[in-house]
C-alpha cells in the first residue's frame, strides 16, 4: 500500500518540487506491518543548478541480521528497528555531449540507527556519491 503527495512550481529561472511518500508492507506469515516514509525537495535555480534534500525512514525486520544467509527453518520475521537517512546534494548542468543534458554533482547521506545495528551499519554510517548525470535533452524532469 502506498500514498504520496507532490508539488511542483515554476520559478523565474528554475523550478521547485516536493514529494511526501508513505509505503506499507505486511509480512504474509505473521501479518506484521512495516512502514516507510520519504520527504524530498529539489530546487533548480539560476538555470543550471540543482540542490536537494531527502529524509527517509524505514522499518527493518530481523531478516536484516541474517546477512546473506538463507532463512533457517522456523525463522519468523520480526520488527527490529527503524532506520533514517538524511541526504543533501547538489549538481550543476554543463554542456558536454550534443543532444544530452549533463551535470556533475555530489550528495552526502547520514544514517540514524539504533545501537543493535552498529555491526551492520557501523558506528557512524555515512555515504558520499560523486556523479555525472546524463539524460536526453528536453526532459521535463528537473532532477
Regions found by a protein language model. Name each.
Residues 1, 14, 33-37, 82-86, ...:
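Residues that define the transmembrane beta-barrel architecture of outer-membrane proteins
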Residues 7-16, 48, 95-104, 137-143:
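Short loop/turn motifs that connect adjacent beta-strands in outer-membrane beta-barrel proteins
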